[in-house]
């Protein structure tokens, strides 16, 4: 279980973002809906520094000044999910990758559906840019953050990515 030691809610062009950190780094970003509920936590200075840096970098990303994040992360998931998330983090700003190509990139070409599950379980959207993963035809598929596909469209448009 991840121990959240700092959290901040910040505004963005896609809605409110809840940034949470442990002592090690950012452990989640939630794109909040009006019904979202936040859990209590005990604050730590180290974790607060991670949240401060993530907040600054997200602001720079949304203003078009930042293309690659450098904030420390504290990712928790299965080894398969970790592989998928690490590969997603390599997708360049303004580029996309299909689920099938992502499966090939992790050397598991038959795992497109499992890759989709790992993409949907990404705890740190935007910083781990799962919005850049598309269907094989370039069609927009699901997005678990915020309002779903409309949120994904906004993120892709921000990066100048065309979609169907």
Where are these regions (language model features)?
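Conserved hydrophobic "DFG−1" position in protein kinase catalytic cores
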Residues: 21, 134-135
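DNA major-groove recognition helix of helix-turn-helix
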Residues: 119
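…primarily DNA-binding HTH/wHTH and HhH modules…
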Residues: 136-164
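Helix-turn-helix DNA-binding helix
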Residues: 112-115
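Basic nucleic-acid-binding alpha-helical/helix-turn surface characteristic of O6-alkylguanine DNA
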Residues: 1-110, 158-164
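Terminal helix-turn-helix DNA-binding modules in bacterial transcription factors
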Residues: 122-123
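Short Lys/Arg-enriched helix C-cap and helix-to-coil transition segments
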Residues: 126-133
